[in-house]
Design a protein with these regions (language model features):
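Flexible, solvent-exposed loop segments that connect beta-strands
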Residues: 20-22, 45-55, 85-105, 132-149, ...
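Glycine- and aromatic-enriched membrane insertion/assembly motifs of diderm outer-membrane
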Residues: 32-36, 52-98, 106
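Short glycine-rich beta-strand segments
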Residues: 38-46, 82-88, 111-117, 121-136, ...
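Repeated loop/turn-to-beta-strand initiation elements of outer-membrane beta-barrel proteins
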Residues: 73-77, 119-122, 160, 164-170
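Outer-membrane beta-barrel "beta-signal"
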Residues: 156-166, 189-203
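Bacterial N-terminal signal peptides
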Residues: 1-10
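Short glycine/proline- and aromatic-enriched beta-strand/turn motifs that initiate or cap beta-hairpins
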Residues: 14-69, 120, 124, 175, ...
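Residue-level signature of outer-membrane beta-barrel architecture
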Residues: 67-69, 112-114, 160-162, 201
């Protein structure tokens, strides 16, 4: 199981492996592949405005592997597999009852990367949540809360190179849908955007 955000931390400082060479350019690679791994934190803004249930998300964690195809110096297309874990405190508004809802998520973003000055990277694209699982326990019995995130999201991120093999990255994930969840007999709709931040390492 991958170490678990979030968010699609963007394709970043990555080990580079040329796959083609530009003619007449002194052998400098024009197209190359890049790889990276990273870890970070993720915070979810989870809202259920019409429900009888109050939700308090906690800071979670994420881990990811990335791959990108880079064209020249300024443009790349990439993807990643990101595993994240976290928790939400759910409580009933009309009584003193709360439970910790444990969440696990797997996301696969696909994004366009714009690179500036070999230091800053801007990342934009869709993010697909292929697994979103949340559950809590009542008297030793597991209860299913339902998916925390919709299947399709949009994401934008920024990466800043700290060293030759290390980048600091942040990302915002916006949901393109609503979720339906259940807690102690109450069914309600939720919306869930995310903010992630972390470090990406060249290897």
């Amino acid at each position: 199981m991958l170490l678990g955000v979030i968010s699609f931390l963007p394709v970043s400082a990555l080990a580079q492996c040329p796959v083609s060479v530009a003619a007449g350019d002194g052998g400098a690679p024009r197209t190359k592949t890049e790889f990276a791994i990273g870890v970070g934190g993720v915070y979810t803004m989870l809202e259920a405005p019409s429900a009888d249930v109050a939700l308090k998300p906690r800071l979670g964690y994420q881990g990811y592997v990335q791959m990108a195809l880079v064209f020249g110096r300024f443009i790349g297309v990439g993807t990643e597999i990101c595993y994240s874990g976290g928790s939400v405190i759910a409580s009933l508004k009309d009584m003193e009852f709360e439970r910790t809802v444990r969440t696990t998520t797997v996301d696969i973003p696909i994004f366009l990367t714009l690179r500036f000055l070999n230091i800053v990277r801007l990342n934009l694209g869709p993010q697909f949540t292929v697994m979103s699982r949340a559950e809590y326990s009542v008297d030793g019995n597991t209860q299913f809360f339902g998916p925390v995130y919709p299947t399709v999201n949009a994401t934008a991120g920024l990466g800043i190179k700290l060293f030759s093999n290390l980048m600091l990255e942040a990302r915002y994930v916006y949901p393109l849908g609503v979720g339906t969840n259940q807690f102690m007999g109450h069914e309600f709709e939720t919306t869930s955007s995310r903010v992630t931040a972390g470090l990406t390492l060249v290897f």
